[in-house]
């Protein structure tokens, strides 16, 4: 080895200049390490392909190759960490451990038991180095928000039971007082309601007139669209209006139908003006007392003399219902 180093030392000494002669140092040029190990000094630039000891397997050259592999691995690791920091991913090495813990949580009974199991496994496991201990601490930090964020992880059946409530939130089964979303007949836009006897009578006649105007269904409200009033019997009653008058609610009509704008062209009359009895008979049948069990279909067209103004006048007489009924019945008897 001494003989090999001699020419290298000679070339090195020959390249030096006396201190008093040169005023500026020459730039340092990297030399080939493999050639240096074998006693030759050759510049590294453009020499890698043509190096004579490129495939040398001696001890020094093998150490050089191992060092190059380690440095390449470190560079690749630094690039990977930089990319993960840009993407917001932290600790990629511990992801399989976190996935196993999540699988244990899903198959376990409750979150408290899972926390105890995880803590027991981590206390029993002896860390071999400081890096493993720090990784376990990081996994513990990642477990806590995962358990709190999941909320009801104790039983997944609760989530399955809650899903139909949110999916069928506006469906008819949740609202027993409504037949459909708008609650109007599909073929005729006449305002419909039932005519029953006793306390089931929800119309404008009888003792329910003493209650507030909110108890009247939308079939008897004169401000709705059209002048036709339709009364259905018990066989054709709607399922949404089967309750008593105090539990009934208004039927909803969409705003595009209009409120107080009659449209006789779109709503065909149920009966003609000739088929309807006289004015007094129609008024007596509409304002009949609750004791009379008049069932059937009575529809007043837009050409009938009973207009919205007369119905509004009748609706305004709610405080004096008994006196108004008495005067109406006497007027009907005098007319007959």
From Swiss-Prot:
GO CC aspect terms: nucleus
The identity of this protein, by name, is Doublesex- and mab-3-related transcription factor 1A
**Which Pfam families does this UniProt record tie to the protein?**
DM (PF00751), Dmrt1 (PF12374)
Q: Which family does it belong to?
A: Belongs to the DMRT family.
Entries under SUPFAM superfamilies matching the protein: Cysteine-rich DNA binding domain, (DM domain)
The answer to whether UniProt assigns keyword tRNA-binding to this entry is no
Q: Which gene encodes it?
A: dmrt1-a
Q: Where are the stretches annotated Disordered?
A: 1-28, 117-136, 285-336
Q: Which positions make up the DNA-binding region?
A: 32-79
- Where does this chain mainly localize? nucleus
């Amino acid at each position: 080895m001494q003989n090999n180093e001699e020419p290298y030392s000679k070339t090195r000494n020959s390249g030096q200049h006396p201190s008093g002669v040169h005023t500026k140092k020459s730039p340092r040029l990297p030399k080939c390490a493999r050639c240096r190990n074998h006693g030759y000094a050759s510049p590294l630039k453009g020499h890698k392909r043509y190096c004579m000891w490129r495939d040398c397997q001696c001890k020094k050259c093998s150490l050089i190759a191992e060092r190059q592999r380690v440095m390449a691995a470190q560079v690749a690791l630094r690039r990977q960490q930089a990319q993960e920091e840009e993407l917001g991913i932290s600790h990629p090495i511990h992801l399989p451990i976190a996935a196993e813990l999540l699988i244990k949580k899903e198959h376990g009974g409750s979150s408290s038991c899972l926390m105890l199991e995880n803590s027991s496994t981590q206390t029993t496991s002896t860390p071999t180095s400081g890096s493993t201990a720090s990784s376990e601490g990081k996994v513990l930090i990642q477990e806590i928000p995962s358990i709190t964020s999941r909320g009801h992880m104790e039983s997944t059946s609760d989530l399955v039971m809650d899903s139909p409530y949110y999916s069928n939130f506006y469906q008819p089964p949740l609202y027993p007082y409504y037949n459909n979303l708008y609650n109007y007949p599909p073929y005729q836009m006449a305002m419909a309601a039932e005519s029953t006897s006793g306390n089931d009578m929800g119309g404008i006649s009888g003792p329910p007139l003493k209650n507030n105007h909110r108890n009247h269904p939308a079939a008897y409200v004169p401000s709705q669209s059209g002048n036709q009033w339709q009364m259905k019997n018990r066989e054709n009653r709607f399922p949404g209006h089967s309750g008593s008058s105090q539990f009934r609610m208004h039927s909803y009509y969409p705003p595009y139908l209009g409120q107080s704008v009659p449209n006789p062209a779109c709503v065909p009359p149920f009966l003609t003006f000739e088929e309807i009895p006289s004015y007094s008979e129609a008024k007596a049948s509409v304002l009949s007392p609750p004791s009379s069990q008049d069932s059937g279909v009575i529809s007043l067209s837009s050409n009938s003399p009973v207009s919205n103004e007369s119905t509004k006048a009748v609706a305004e007489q709610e405080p004096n219902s008994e006196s108004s009924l008495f005067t109406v019945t006497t007027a009907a008897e005098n007319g007959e």
